[in-house]
A protein has these predicted regions:
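Catalytic Walker B motif of ABC-type/P-loop ATPase nucleotide-binding domains
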Residues: 157-160
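Short coil-to-helix segment of the ABC ATPase nucleotide-binding domain corresponding to the Q-loop/switch region
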Residues: 91-99
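Conserved signature/switch motifs of ABC ATPase nucleotide-binding domains
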Residues: 131-134, 152, 184
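ABC ATPase "signature
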Residues: 216-217
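The feature captures the beta-strand-to-loop junction immediately N-terminal to the Walker
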Residues: 22-24
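Helix N-cap at the start of a conserved alpha-helix in ABC-type nucleotide-binding domains
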Residues: 168-170
Length: 240
């Protein structure tokens, strides 16, 4: 039996927008992000990133992805931050940041190191450059993960519930970093349970349930005047 995890998704993200994706667990939010950067492949539809075609459906109904190298290059336009920090435990913080730009993008090592130090300053962790991940708090590790994604110079940042595995007191420091990125007009798609962030920082909120976008709109409309019954029930539960 075929299970459609996502269906009927129609989503436009403009440059500089911050999209908050909310909804109950199992509604397809994380899968949506994974489809955007090709961690999951779609079986119908079109994905266009920064004006470039990543995937399209042919006249025969078959999904065709851009060729290998081109596909990877387009996918690299998106930085991804996961629930779990996924830092390399055997590398220092600085080494974690420079690994992919040097090895994957073949950029100049000395220049990448300078840029990485600037990014660590940006996320408030300059003094942790030579520290190993195990010596950091969860909030610090997640901020390193954000800096590591930014080191690849993405056009778009994808966040998959970046604070869900953090204690409440550590959540604030990660959200603060994300808020600063939003103020710098970084294009962001954020799957989150943090309704305050969605309400205050997002330019658009998308509510998903059962693999579909049930409602989308400006934060003030979604939170103060929700039309969809599922959204109304969801907000009653999470905003108690």
């Amino acid at each position: 039996q075929e299970l459609n995890v996502l269906q009927g998704i129609d989503l436009d993200v403009e440059e500089g927008e911050v999209i908050a994706v909310i909804g109950p667990s199992g509604s397809g939010k994380s899968t949506l992000l994974r489809c955007l950067n090709k961690l999951e492949t779609i079986n119908r539809g079109t994905i266009i990133i920064d004006g470039e075609l990543l995937a399209d459906t042919s006249s025969t109904g078959e999904v065709v992805y851009a060729p290998g190298d081109e596909s990877r290059r387009i996918a690299c336009k998106m930085g991804m931050v996961f629930q779990q920090f996924n830092l390399f435990p055997h590398m220092t913080v600085l080494q974690n940041l420079i690994e992919a730009p040097v090895q994957v993008q073949k950029r100049d090592r000395a220049q990448v190191i300078e840029e990485a130090k600037i990014l660590l300053g940006k996320v408030g962790l300059s003094e942790k450059a030579d520290v190993y991940p195990r010596k950091l708090s969860g909030g610090q590790q997640q901020r390193v993960a954000i800096a590591r994604a930014l080191a690849m110079k993405p056009s778009i940042m994808l966040f998959d519930e970046p604070t869900s595995s953090l204690d409440p007191e550590l959540t604030g420091e990660v959200l603060r970093t994300m808020r600063e990125l939003a103020e710098e007009k970084m294009t962001m798609v954020v799957v989150t349970h943090e309704m305050g962030f969605a309400r205050e920082v997002a330019t658009k909120v998308i509510f998903m349930a059962d693999g579909r976008v049930q409602e989308q709109g400006r934060p003030e409309d979604i939170f103060t005047n929700p039309k969809n019954e599922r959204l109304q029930a969801f907000l009653q539960t999470v905003l108690k």
